Structures are given as structure tokens and as C-alpha cells.
Amino acid sequence: MKKSLLAGAALAAFTLTSAAHAETAVSLGFSGWTGFAPLTLAKEAGIFKKNGLDVTLTKIPQASRHLALASGDIQCAATTVETWIVWNAAGVKTKQIFQMDKSYGADGIAVRADVNSFADLKGKTVAASAPGTSPYFLLAFMLAKNGMTTKDVKVVNMEPGPAAQAFVAGQNDAAMT
């Protein structure tokens, strides 16, 4: 009896110790946007692991991140605030649990030398992420402030990184950051 109590206590202690060290697996989709760098830094520095999380970070373009959430490929997503509204409206039930940072003026538009005003963009090609993303909202806002809409330009769906690369390579007349 004493041996079985001792064995039971040892098993319980082992189970509790193992449970305390068990890591919760979490898969998170994000982009290479600078504001999400703390996620990679936390993983590389072992901060997630130290706090009982086994985090898998997967780069997924903004335009399809909600599909990965809906399908269960990822459990969490790092994205911009307005995106949660768009995803929920599209039937992908999500909840924002925290905000990593705030952008004060980091978003903008790069244009060719011959573009001196928003009126000069009429009929030109602008690279911007999909509708519902910060770059697209900013483009629509800036155009509206200048008496235009996204119908006045040709919007090419490109994430900021590829949009910048394409712009530098001479493609598109403008690119949203």
C-alpha cells in the first residue's frame, strides 16, 4: 500500500511537472511588415518558449491571411486594426486581443517624378494591397481628400514589399507603403 501511494505520488508529481513544462502550440500568420518584427524577435529570443508557448510563425500575404484563419491553418494573425472589421464582415469571425504598435506617419505613397499632384495620378497605375488593408484605405482616403476615388486610378493588388520592388524596377506609376 505504501509503495502504491508512493508510486501514485511520484506519478502525480511527474505529471504535474510535465504539465508545467508542456508548451501550448500556437500558429500565427503575419507579413514581413516592420511593425511585426517583435514577433520574430520574441521567438528567436526564446520569450514565447519561456512562457510555455511553441509558436510557429508563417508569412502569409495580407490578402489571404483571413483564409488561413478560416481554414484553421493558423490560429492567430498579426494584421492592421481595420482588417479585423473587414474579415468579420466577410464572415471570418475574429477578435483583436492586443495592439502591437501604432503607426504615426509611416504609411505613404511613392510616385514617379512626373506626378506633382493627385490629379496627375488620374488613369495611372497604383500598387496597393487588397481592399480592407491599411495601404488601400490610405490610398482611398488620400484620393477622396483630393476629389478622386479608386476608380480614377488603376489599382494593382500588391503587398508593400513587392510594390516597392516593382516601383524601383520601373513598374507602376505609384506604390503605397
Predicted features and spans:
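Absolute protein N-terminus
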Residues: M1, A22-E23
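Bacterial N-terminal signal peptides
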Residues: G8-T15
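Conserved, function-defining micro-sites of small-solute handling proteins
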Residues: A169
